[in-house]
Amino acid sequence: MHINNWPTHERPREKLLAHGAATLSDAELLAIFLGSGLRGHDAVQTARNLLHTHGPLRELLDRPPGDLMRLPGLGLARACKLTAALELSTRHLAAALQRGASIHDPISAGRYFAQRLRANPNEVFAVLFLDNRHRAISFEELFHGTINGAEVHPREVVRRALTLNAAAVIVGHNHPSGNREPSPADRMITQRLKNALDLIDVRLVDHFVIGDGAPVSFAEHGWL
């Protein structure tokens, strides 16, 4: 059945307008981008097939344009548009920080960490330093590790916070495996970091774990 024959409330575009993009599935978002599907399939089914065969979403979107253009349902034009859309998203988030916008929205902060860290093949631990109005001072990748982990030194985060005269920090790291579940080591270093920052009156606002799907927020889960 063509999407135009679906009930209005089930169509991806109408759902986006009524409830926001965040409520759509990966396949529905990709279907909106595709616009139309392969012969005999609607855009949603084509998107589902792409994700099933070449996904999950992170792996699909991390592909270079040369790889994307060879996938069924994409081609040269869509591959270039998709790559450009991802870069625009990254620049939009970066521009907001560079303008000194206050960061009070955890979704935007998590999205920024995801854009910066998700494509790394090894684990990277980064820190976003904020002033007393929660405006960005600096985003720094402080610790680089292997595919299995990165060694984090709270004293180095404290040193940089003092140097930058930061009032608060948001930290985040990626899991190259794609598994977003925080490990026991993640929870332990978060507590050590919070304790160290408390000593210099710098607030740890959040810790994001980046994997497949939406970032996991320690603050949102009450783990801080």
From Swiss-Prot:
Could you list the residue ranges forming a coiled coil in this record? none
Q: Which InterPro entries match?
A: MPN (IPR037518), RadC_JAB (IPR025657), RuvA_2-like (IPR010994), UPF0758 (IPR001405), UPF0758_CS (IPR020891), UPF0758_N (IPR046778)
* Recorded superkingdom: Bacteria
A single GO BP: proteolysis
Q: Please name the CDD domains in this protein's record.
A: MPN_DUF2466 (cd08071)
Q: Which Pfam families match?
A: RadC, UPF0758_N
The MPN domain is annotated at: 102-224
Q: What is this protein called?
A: UPF0758 protein XF_0148
A molecular function GO annotation = metal ion binding
